[in-house]
Amino acid sequence: LDINGKEVSLSDLKGKYVYIDIWATWCGPCNAEIPHLKKLEKQFEGRNICFVSISSDRSREVWEKFVKNRKLGGIQLHMGNDRKFMKEICCYGIPHFLLIDRDGNFINANMLRPSDPKTREILKGFERI
């Protein structure tokens, strides 16, 4: 569910490249990536790349407060106690980043972090496609 309680599916994002961030409010390295992720979101705003952040926080209340206080952008989702998605993609630690193509297929299931300068260049390459 997103920050407004609306269900969001990957099929809703078809036609766009999707950069996914799996994170949690309590995760120091995750928090360190937030300013870099915000910068990427701003640079690619209105383009064919969508940014989705999926929180693995157990408490929806803690997550909602954090998202609102930090004014996080992109599509903000909360997985709660359901770790099915993380198991399916073999995600055993956070932060974890993924890149999905316009048809919903994985391009990279272990994508670089937003703080890595190569990430911007990779995403820029998809603008031309």
Where are the model-predicted features located?
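A short beta-strand-turn-helix
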Residues: 1-18
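Flexible loop/turn segments at secondary-structure boundaries
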Residues: 7-8, 26-29, 58-62, 84-86, ...
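Conserved redox-active cysteine motifs that mediate thiol-disulfide chemistry
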Residues: 14, 22-39
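Active-site acidic short loop of glycosyltransferases
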Residues: 14-16, 46, 72, 91
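Structural microenvironment flanking redox-active thiols in thiol-disulfide oxidoreductases
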Residues: 32-70, 81-87, 121
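Thiol/disulfide oxidoreductase modules built on the thioredoxin-like
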Residues: 70-72, 79-126
